[in-house]
Swiss-Prot record:
Organism: Geobacillus sp. (strain WCH70)
GO molecular function: rRNA binding; structural constituent of ribosome; tRNA binding
InterPro entries from the UniProt entry: Ribosom_uL1_bac-type, Ribosomal_uL1, Ribosomal_uL1-like, Ribosomal_uL1/biogenesis, Ribosomal_uL1_3-a/b-sand, Ribosomal_uL1_CS
Keyword Repressor in annotation: yes
The protein's name: Large ribosomal subunit protein uL1
Length: 233
């Protein structure tokens, strides 16, 4: 394990590692234990009872957080003609076709999200080995392969986040910054929690949400009691 600094150890003393806190209390603790000198990101980690090795237990999707993440997302759109104009009008940072494919192949990555129209995927597919490992490959499940490029760009700019289960059965999602009001962080948390509950694979057996932890960029993890979260039925 990496050696922890004095500030981290002092912050960690405020947290009972064996307790799952009500969401409101957990958010308050995230702020108290934040040791970063910058406006740290608040992230939630879900440990799920799924086997990601099985195709019918993969979880991937996207949801628009009501208060965004506090980060301005740079959006690259692969589109032509009218669709390119729509993407530009919606606020995309970069819009084009083959010229951006060449740039990426040469090591350009000044973007955070990639959107593509379906007719461009034949060309964009050439970037699979480059974009895939970085989690940047457009995908219909996350709404980033679509002809409605304007809606896709607007949602991303408004605070849309993607979630995807990793090989260990975990999902990590940013829900804002420590500077956010507690209520806004709680509402963002509830939104992503509801999305993950709805995404439960039919093949998943036993306890689905095993563990929920919330943390700031450099702070200690704080367990959350999911039963304290009011979710829509």
């Amino acid at each position: 394990m990496p050696k922890r600094g004095k500030k981290y150890l002092e912050a960690a003393k405020l947290v009972d590692r064996f307790k799952a806190y009500p969401i409101a209390e957990a958010i308050e603790l995230v702020k108290k234990t934040n040791i970063a000198k910058f406006d740290a990101t608040v992230e939630v980690a879900f440990r799920l009872g799924v086997d990601p090795k099985k195709a019918d237990q993969q979880i991937r999707g996207a949801v628009v957080l009501p208060h965004g993440t506090g980060k301005v997302q740079r959006v690259l759109v692969f589109a032509k003609g009218e669709k390119a104009k729509e993407a530009e009008a919606a606020g995309a940072d970069y819009v084009g076709d083959t010229e951006y494919i060449n740039k990426i192949q040469q090591g350009w990555f000044d973007f955070d999200v990639v959107v593509a129209t379906p007719d461009m995927m034949g060309e964009v597919g050439k970037l699979g080995r480059i974009l895939g490992p970085k989690g940047l490959m457009p995908n219909p499940k996350t709404g980033t392969v679509t002809f409605d490029v304007a809606k896709a760009v607007q949602e991303i700019k408004a605070g849309k986040v993607e979630y995807r289960v990793d090989k260990a059965g975990n999902i990590h999602v940013p829900i804002g910054k420590v500077s956010f009001d507690n209520e806004k962080l709680a509402e963002n948390f509830t939104t992503i929690y509801e999305a993950i509950l709805k995404a439960k694979p039919a093949a998943a057996k036993g306890t689905y949400v095993k563990n929920v932890t919330i943390t700031s960029t450099m702070g200690p993890g704080i367990k959350v009691d999911p039963s304290t979260v009011a979710v829509a039925q």
